[in-house]
């Protein structure tokens, strides 16, 4: 087994070894002897070796205050607009410079009088004043600002900007895949000009909440600089009516993801459409250009019955155990070759989860809820290989939320529940807790404490499943994003010891705060990210 030695240097004192025996039973260490009034630098080595694997310094200011977070100051935006403010929204992480440490990629949205959120039901009219309406920014965990991309007037406030951070070309550094348009200004100052020669680069329409046309692109950005590495045309708009309305809202249902559709290399997945026509495309990036792998189109004369089966999110995974990823998109699944794999015809919904939820069943399962299922089903557990329903909850309305997580040590596998519903076992048995005014959160699940069961993250607090408080995050002057969704900017296993860190923005929108656990544990696992 792998063992570690840990050393500490306090201020100008000599370095000391903290462990008497090699650390083999955990991937964390709680130092109870450190002088909090001094900077403490920790050095990690393999047991019996003096070769440094990593170092990290906890400053006296951090330690003396006893704060369970690190701060990343947000860059000012007066260079973008002296009149408008930009608020932090969704974030992701990736190793942008190849140094083995994650950086943060953050989306910032234009603040307005009626909404600062990335809401699915965004009804606010397009902002006509400022030129740049959505920002992407990159930060190092030490607070250093790396770059900014201003996506321009044709990528407005709303749920219209999804992005993926991944090492698409295998060079050890992550790129960013994002939808761009005329007017986008990249991290090196390069701008997408008038590409179609129509004499304009601003396609906003006064009084409308959505863009009515203009060239759209898929761009791949260099993670270190934010400059554009490659560009191709995005899935074409065509007619608004094809996508389910005549006012350009449903045609702006964009999704992005990452899938290993070849079985060996990652591809960029882009999607357009949920309620009517749906198009998905897979693109490969190998350092200089984008090459289309496949296209799935419900108007191709073959997959017409898949129309309207999309979702407000998507999940990617190998559902049929063939070594290649598939795309689970609401009521349907697209095979790794871009062909329809199955269509359960449940329709679309707000939440969808793919994973190994029932250990007694072969393969993966899907837990999701639906807005207006034709079978009058509010939430269902389906077999990911076939789309077959395993069990479901009858409901004729819009079931807006559901969640699945292993929260109960007394119940095998994962537990599942929905808005105001009791927790159920993976086989559908009612476990008798959760419903009512004190119902469990159905928002997000997180590993934060020393338990192998997950805890529930909602509204800047973490609770165990049966109303036991684990951490009150809102005490540290942070806020959530996306209005009623009450999301953090991001959460994942950033440090690598399998517990998850949580990134939230301060209430005054001046910095990100990355919260990490202080619970020691002797449970070990590979990193979850």
Predicted regions and their residues:
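Beta-propeller domains
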Residues: 236-241, 245-424
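Acidic/hydrophobic-patterned starts of short beta strands in beta-sheet-rich repeat architectures
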Residues: 98-108, 170-179, 263-271, 321-329, ...
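Conserved small/polar residues in nucleotide/adenosyl-binding loops
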Residues: 527-528
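Beta-strand-rich modules
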Residues: 35-48
């Amino acid at each position: 087994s792998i063992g570690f030695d840990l050393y500490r240097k306090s201020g100008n004192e000599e370095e000391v070894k903290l462990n008497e025996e090699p650390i083999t039973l955990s991937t964390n260490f709680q130092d109870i002897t450190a002088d909090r009034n001094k900077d403490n630098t920790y050095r990690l080595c393999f047991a019996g070796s003096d070769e440094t694997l990593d170092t990290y310094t906890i400053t006296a200011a951090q330690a003396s205050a006893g704060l369970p977070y690190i701060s990343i100051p947000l860059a000012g935006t007066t260079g973008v607009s002296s009149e408008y403010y930009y608020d932090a929204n969704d974030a992701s992480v990736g190793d942008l410079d190849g140094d083995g440490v994650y950086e943060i990629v953050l989306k910032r949205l234009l603040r307005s009088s009626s909404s600062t959120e990335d809401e699915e039901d965004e009804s606010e009219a397009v902002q006509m004043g400022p030129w740049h309406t959505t920002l992407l920014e990159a930060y190092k965990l030490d607070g250093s600002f790396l770059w900014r991309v201003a996506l321009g007037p044709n990528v407005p406030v709303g749920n219209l900007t999804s992005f993926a951070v991944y090492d698409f070309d295998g060079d050890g550094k992550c790129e960013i895949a994002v939808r761009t348009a005329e007017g986008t200004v990249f991290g090196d100052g390069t701008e997408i000009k008038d590409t179609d020669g129509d004499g304009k680069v601003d396609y906003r329409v006064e009084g409308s909440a959505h863009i009515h046309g203009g060239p759209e692109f898929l761009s791949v950005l260099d993670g270190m600089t934010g400059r554009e590495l490659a560009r191709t045309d995005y899935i074409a708009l065509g007619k608004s009516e094809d996508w389910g309305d005549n006012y350009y809202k449903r045609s702006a249902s964009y999704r992005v993801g990452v899938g290993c559709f070849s079985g060996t290399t990652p591809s960029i997945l882009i999607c357009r459409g949920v309620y009517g026509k749906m198009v998905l495309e897979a693109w490969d990036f190998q350092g200089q250009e984008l090459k289309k792998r496949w296209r799935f189109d419900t108007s191709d004369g073959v997959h017409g019955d898949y129309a309207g089966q999309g979702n407000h999110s998507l999940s990617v995974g190998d559902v049929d155990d063939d070594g290649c990823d598939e795309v689970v998109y609401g009521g349907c699944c697209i095979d790794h070759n871009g062909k329809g794999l199955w269509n359960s015809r449940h329709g679309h919904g707000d939440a969808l989860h793919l994973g190994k939820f029932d250990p007694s069943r072969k393969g993966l399962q899907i837990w999701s809820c639906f807005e207006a299922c034709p079978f009058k089903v509010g939430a269902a557990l389906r077999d990911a290989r076939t789309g077959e329903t395993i069990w479901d909850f009858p409901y004729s309305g819009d079931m807006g939320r559901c969640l699945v997580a292993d929260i109960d040590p007394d119940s095998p596998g994962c537990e599942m529940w929905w808005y105001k519903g009791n927790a159920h076992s993976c086989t559908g048995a009612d476990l008798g807790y959760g419903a009512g005014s004190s119902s469990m959160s159905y928002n997000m699940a997180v590993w934060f404490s020393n338990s192998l069961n997950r805890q529930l993250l909602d509204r800047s607090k973490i609770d165990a499943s049966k109303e036991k408080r684990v951490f009150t995050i809102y005490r540290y002057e942070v806020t959530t994003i996306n209005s009623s969704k009450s999301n953090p900017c991001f959460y994942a296993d950033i440090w690598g010891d399998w517990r998850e860190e949580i990134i939230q923005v301060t209430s005054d929108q001046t910095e990100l705060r990355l919260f990490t656990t202080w619970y020691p544990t002797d449970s070990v696992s590979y990193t979850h990210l």
